[in-house]
């Protein structure tokens, strides 16, 4: 047994109270890790309690670097799981759908219903294809006018908010200041999902409540009941419109009020499998998954992308000069600072990775955050650079991309379980950002109102999920 293994065993053999107790770790300057000691051979030790600390959630990347370099498959006895942190190892597991299953049935089904998240193989592909066809290719392109219309409507509302001297939007002479999350990013992706699904406008406020409750309900027992109740409310509502949509389809409209395509609920209501219409439960589960996939991912992408671009003026100028660079900014943002941390898997057989034996049935956490910062794949991974030559910027592929020195990021995963909302999230973030830029003259961050780092002066790190507040100001003329 190495000295590192001995340290971990000693920690695990402590009393349960000691092992699980909250440990205070000092907040370190961005890029530095707390010194938790070293083994005799110089290997840095890692106390798994750091993974629950404010320091880790504030800036996890120094700790992911320790895991990648020294514990690429880390047996975390505190959380009873194995952390997998290298890009190549994670992609191998994602593509092996038989050997590394998704989360067990029932872990999210109470809130989201029986979704494809809990399926594998043929049944997973069948479920994915039921709605996936409506979120890619020409079908997705037909929905872009609706996305543009909603973005403009939300920005139009800023005028009223500023006149009312809103807490989050106000004017000062020729300058308007606003908080982007409250005035746009929080609600925009949910409005888009409502629109493309085909929810009537009068039901969208209720839908927003259902969404927030279901997402909150995935986080733990304290909010699980509320999430289940919200999901039931959504299913009851959908049941009331299924037959109506089969008889009288509804359509998405462009900014001039012209129909562009049938909404997704109508499409699902018209879908048959083996000669039978989908059940209300199946339709609701598909809707719940689309809602979850297209919400927080997009909100985080918009917030992080604008924060990063505005703090890298040369790259923001490149986006202003060429709208095609928004796609590059989107992909680099998700590589650099995704709001999606990873996906759990359970191995169906005993495996050994990097000398670590993982018994069948173990919980293995595939840490996409860490894979996106793997120095073996991406040069200077902690630098934000929309023109890096090692990142693939093209169409999102279920097969991933790894050619000619370029690799796809892992924010949406890869393989059979690539995030179902990846394509619509991309369009929401890019189309919405293009319209934001067209409606704001000389946008910049209002640093006086932004959260500060531990020195009280420099900007706070982006953290493990995404920027929660982004105060902007721009010229009105």
Enumerate the predicted regions with their spans.
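Cytochrome P450
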Residues: 2-477
């Amino acid at each position: 047994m190495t000295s590192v293994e001995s340290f971990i065993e000693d920690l695990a053999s402590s009393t349960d109270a000691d092992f699980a107790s909250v440990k205070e770790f000092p907040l370190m300057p961005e890029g530095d890790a707390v010194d938790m000691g070293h083994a005799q051979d110089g290997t840095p030790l890692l106390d798994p309690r750091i993974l629950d600390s404010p320091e880790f959630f504030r800036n996890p990347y120094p700790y992911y670097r320790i895991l990648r370099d020294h514990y690429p498959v880390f047996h975390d006895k505190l959380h009873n799981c194995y952390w997998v942190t290298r890009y190549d190892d994670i992609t191998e597991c994602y593509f092996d759908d038989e050997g590394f299953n998704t989360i067990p049935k029932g872990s999210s089904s109470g809130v989201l219903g029986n979704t494809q998240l809990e399926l594998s193989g043929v049944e997973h592909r069948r479920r994915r294809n039921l709605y996936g066809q409506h979120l890619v290719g020409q079908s997705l392109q037909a929905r872009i006018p609706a996305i543009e219309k909603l973005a403009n409507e939300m920005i139009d509302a800023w005028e009223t908010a500023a006149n009312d001297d809103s807490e989050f939007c106000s004017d000062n002479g020729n300058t308007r200041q606003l908080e982007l999350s409250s005035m746009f990013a929080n609600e925009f992706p949910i409005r888009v999902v409502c629109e493309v699904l085909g929810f009537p406008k009068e039901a969208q406020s209720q839908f927003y409540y259902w969404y927030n409750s279901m997402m909150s309900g995935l986080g733990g027992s304290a909010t699980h009941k509320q999430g289940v109740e919200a999901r039931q409310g959504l299913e009851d509502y959908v049941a009331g419109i299924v037959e109506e949509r089969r008889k009288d389809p509804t359509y998405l409209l462009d900014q001039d009020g012209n129909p562009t395509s049938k909404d997704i609920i109508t499409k699902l209501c018209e879908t048959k499998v083996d000669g039978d219409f989908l059940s209300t439960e199946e339709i609701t589960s598909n809707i719940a998954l689309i809602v979850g996939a297209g919400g927080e991912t997009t909100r985080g992408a918009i917030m992080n992308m604008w924060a990063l671009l505005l703090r890298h003026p040369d790259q923001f100028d490149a986006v202003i000069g060429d709208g095609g660079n928004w796609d590059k900014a989107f992909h680099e943002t998700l590589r650099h600072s995704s709001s999606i941390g990873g996906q759990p898997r359970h191995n169906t057989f005993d495996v050994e990775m990097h000398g670590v034996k993982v018994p069948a049935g173990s919980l293995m956490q595939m840490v996409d955050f860490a894979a996106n910062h793997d120095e073996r794949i991406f040069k200077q991974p902690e630098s934000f650079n929309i023109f890096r030559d090692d990142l693939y910027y093209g169409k999102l592929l279920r097969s991933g991309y790894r050619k000619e020195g370029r690799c796809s990021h892992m924010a949406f995963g890869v393989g059979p379980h690539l995030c179902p909302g990846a394509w619509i999230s991309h369009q929401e973030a890019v189309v919405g950002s293009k319209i934001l830029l067209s409606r704001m003259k000389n946008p910049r961050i209002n640093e006086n109102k932004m959260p500060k780092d531990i020195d009280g002066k420099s900007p706070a790190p982006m953290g493990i999920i995404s920027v929660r507040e982004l105060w902007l100001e721009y010229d009105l003329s």
